[in-house]
Amino acid sequence: KRQVERFGEPVVPDFEVPYHTDIMESFNGIDLDSARKVAGNGFYYLMGDIARLHSAVISYARDFMINRGFTYCVPPFMIRSDVVTGVMSFAEMDAMMYKIEGEDLYLIGTSEHSMIGKFIDTVNKEENLPYTLTSYSPCFRKEKGAHGLEERGVYRIHQFEKQEMIVICKPEDSMMWYDKLWKNTVDLFRSMDIPVRTLECCSGDLADLKVKSVDVEAWSPRQKKYFEVGSCSNLGDAQARRLGIRVVGPDKTKYLAHTLNNTVVAPPRMLIAFLENNLQADGSVRIPEVLRPYMGGMEKMVPKK
């Protein structure tokens, strides 16, 4: 991967930054043991101010995207197999998706799939493009494979919440939208005082169907390096071809649309970056101005223990 651009100066504080679960525990904000008893590994309970912060980030991200002209959408959290195979490869499906036993339904791994699926087998007037949607949803993923020490806590989990954005547009506009989408995520993180960078994925690292992709990474003061918090992808006409998403022009000519998607914010990983970058020497966590209206005016969170 090649670094495209860096936004904000990474800061290494002059005090030790604890692991994110330790920070959360200082606020009585996470219970992994109870979650393990209830659902197994890869789940969590968020409590108190940490749970409130989680909801605040989602609410802020929703309003952020609405203010940028996106239509807010609450999509289905389950999708049929013809939609699954239209938006991703079988290998990706097998590694990610949970199937509902006895039903032709899968739990979504991202709301991108159900938002893109909204347009299955449609012919859309060119004059109505682009369609720009943003949604909040829970996401469910198998997350197969071994996980390292840095993936404990809420870093890699089976259930999480995410604000997503998708675009359906004319082919000649897709690269313009690609740049707009990842810049939305960068702007969101910077508004919360979190340094980020973008990495362009090489062709060998691209998932099936993707034409171009960029990862957004946030700075971790504890690890003194960046870690992935989202990705933006241009899928060209690959999904549109599989799902039958067509466009009709003024001359009645029909052609395939282009589809794009991008993570606005996934709070579990974003919370890691947020807590580390806003942690103070006394253990309190500063609340950036943009989040204060969603936190009842709170300017900082104070540890409970």
Regions found by a protein language model. Give the residues of each.
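TRNA-recognition modules of translation machinery and tRNA-sensing kinases, especially anticodon-binding
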Residues: 6-305
